[in-house]
Amino acid sequence: MSRQPTTTKKPKPLSKKKKPVSISKLKNKLWEECKRIIRARYQREDGRWDCFTCGAIIEEPKDCHTGHFIPSSTGGALLRHHLHNLRPQDYRCNINGGGQGAEFYRRLVETEGQEYVDNLFRLKHQTVKADRWWYEQKILEYKEILE
């Protein structure tokens, strides 16, 4: 009896379906939209920015941080990406100074009013289901702002 050579099966090609974008990639994409909006909204006519907390002039976009009034660690997904909670800051205030919360508060009350700030504190206690749909909707909403 002669043996037939064994044939190895070719692996099936992987399906052509695209994997859904991960939530972490959606978070990053939403954060990029937030930064674009804040930079556009608070840019001076000469193309520079003022640090919201110390008033220093920020020359380059790479040096213009988007700082949080209520830190993202305590504000959750809602305030992490809420445009009312964000302002331009320089590196020194945002990173070295931990966001300069007291000065941020004072300036926010001065420029927007106490009711505005109180509303942000109310939002701090709201929870949202930050799932894929929520991030996708926010990205679409924020893209429309700059168009």
What are these regions, as identified by a protein language model?
Residues 1-37, 42, 56-57, 120-147:
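A boundary/linker detector
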Residues 26, 78, 96:
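Conserved aromatic-histidine-acidic binding/catalytic patches
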Residues 31, 35, 39, 48-51, ...:
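A general structural signal for well-ordered alpha-helical packing
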Residues 39-45, 78-83:
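Immediate flanking context of iron-sulfur cluster ligation sites
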Residues 50-86:
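Histidine-centered nuclease catalytic patch
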Residues 56-59, 83-113:
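Short Cys/His-centered divalent metal-binding micro-motifs
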Residues 72-85, 109-124:
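Short microdomains enriched in Cys/His and/or Lys/Arg
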